[in-house]
A protein has these predicted regions:
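Non-catalytic cap/lid and distal C-terminal segments of serine-dependent acyl enzymes
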Residues: 19-191
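Sec-dependent N-terminal signal peptides
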Residues: 4-14
Length: 191
């Protein structure tokens, strides 16, 4: 009864249990030899991560055009949703990784000028596996993406089926590189 009363008092005072939320780390970065630049990412570790030796599954989240490594956190509120669903027993704890995809479509370009998929598969996934307690089997990795990220989720997972056990593409932007080259979408975002 005392715990319930304390929670009600804290909730009414505007403190809604934020101390129990997952650990959000925004603005992390890794240098990519493939892309020849630093790539920012956010990572969300489940509550209790720092006090356990459990290996967690990883969900890689790809944003859409105009987004970045903070979009799923700011607009999707994914850390709170994750925490709530774990506490309600609807899902098991897991790690979320949100890399900055720029305008890459999470793919390598035909001419080799941008090697985003190479970065993701050969650099970021191994880096996360080596620096966090992750499940390294196929059922321990998933990808979800929205729009441009939906395209990336489909294309990356289909070419790397041995690494990812599931994929979700939300409103994927299924277009060819030629269409984007001809339309030059960067001009729209720069104006």
């Amino acid at each position: 009864m005392k715990k319930i009363l304390l929670y009600i008092i804290l909730f009414l005072s505007g403190i809604d249990g934020a101390w129990a939320l997952p650990i959000e780390k925004e603005g992390m970065s890794i240098y990519s030899p493939s892309l020849k630049q630093e790539v920012s990412y956010s990572i969300i570790l489940p509550e209790g991560y720092e006090h356990s030796d459990t290996e967690y599954p990883v969900l890689y989240m790809f944003h859409g055009i105009g987004g970045d490594y903070t979009s799923w956190l700011e607009y999707g509120n994914v850390a709170r949703v994750m925490d709530k669903m774990i506490k309600e027993g609807k899902i098991q704890p897991f790690i979320m990784v949100i890399p900055d995809g720029y305008l890459s479509y999470y793919s390598d370009t035909y001419d080799g000028s941008s090697l985003y998929e190479t970065f993701f598969i050969k650099e970021l996934v191994p880096y996360i596996d080596n620096n966090y307690r992750t499940r390294k089997d196929i059922n321990g990795r998933s990808i979800i993406g929205f729009s441009m990220g939906g395209f990336g989720a489909l294309s990356v997972s289909l070419r790397n089926r041995h690494l990812f056990g599931s994929v979700v593409a939300l409103s994927p932007s299924i277009r060819t590189e030629k269409q984007y080259i001809e339309e030059e979408p960067q001009k729209e975002w720069d104006s």
